[in-house]
Amino acid sequence: MLLGSVPQLDRVAVQLGPFPVYWYGIIIGTGVLLGLWLATREGERLGIPKDTFVDLVLIAVPIAILFARMYYVIFEWEYYAQNPSQIINIRQGGLAIHGGLIGAVITGILFAKRRGVSFWKLADIAAPSILLGQAIGRWGNFMNQEAHGDEVTRQFLEGLHLPDFIINQMYIDGVYYHPTFLYESLWNFAGVILLLALRKVNLRRGELFFTYLIWYSIGRFFVEGLRTDSLMLGPLRIAQVMSIGLVVISIIFIIVRRKMGQADKRYSEN
């Protein structure tokens, strides 16, 4: 697709009759499938049946999407109160990661209790998969030309040595913008490598998941400061508040669980 003289990628991957299939959904789905593959592979190594994570994903993903949308709509209620028909329209974006994470954790706790397995063990195994899904998912925002930062010049983007297809896609309504989707995606990919390395350290059970929360939240806090479409509560950026809260809560949980003897098992123990 061309916008002026700048070639850009079409957010629609394929048109099936009257129904457009957006890259956003394809990319999110790809992230889920790759994350599932990673989790089932590690789960089998640690004695978790393959169908455990398949069943969990089939339940958790729809609930996470529901929570992600609810979270987004709540903080954009002024718009959706005037446009209620758009509340269920998620084909072009409008999913908040923090909302999805809340839904996934609640589902994971209930699922683990029903299956009679440790939630912390499942959470540790799933942590790199979740972050991988988030890293891939940000490219859906790229295709939608959303979740970007403030205005910049083309020269600034070229100075980052970015490929032309990224630079061109950051040209929106006559202006170039910070590719904050890329900053967060790269941070998340680095986090996946870190978490995979920490598996070999054999941390106490639950601490790999808390490391994920801390790592993601630190990156999200700084990237959010560059964005122009943040969900707001008065003067506060909701994602930054949530990020600070998750870091603090994670550190407290690590300390308290150790002191109370609730972190007695290691990552690889049955």
UniProtKB/Swiss-Prot annotation:
A 1,2-diacyl-sn-glycero-3-phospho-(1'-sn-glycerol) binds at residue 138. Its EC number is 2.5.1.145. Keywords: Cell membrane, Membrane, Transferase, Transmembrane, Transmembrane helix. GO terms for molecular function: phosphatidylglycerol-prolipoprotein diacylglyceryl transferase activity. Pfam families: LGT. It is a multi-pass membrane protein. The keyword Transmembrane applies. It is found in: Cell membrane. One of its GO terms (cellular component) is plasma membrane. Pathway: Protein modification; lipoprotein biosynthesis (diacylglyceryl transfer). Its main location: membrane. One of its GO terms (biological process) is lipoprotein biosynthetic process. The chain crosses the membrane at residues 19-39, 56-76, 92-112, 116-136, 178-198, 206-226, 236-256. Catalyzes the transfer of the diacylglyceryl group from phosphatidylglycerol to the sulfhydryl group of the N-terminal cysteine of a prolipoprotein, the first step in the formation of mature lipoproteins. Belongs to the Lgt family. This is Phosphatidylglycerol--prolipoprotein diacylglyceryl transferase. It comes from Bacillus cereus (strain ZK / E33L). The lineage of its organism: Bacteria, Bacillati, Bacillota, Bacilli, Bacillales.
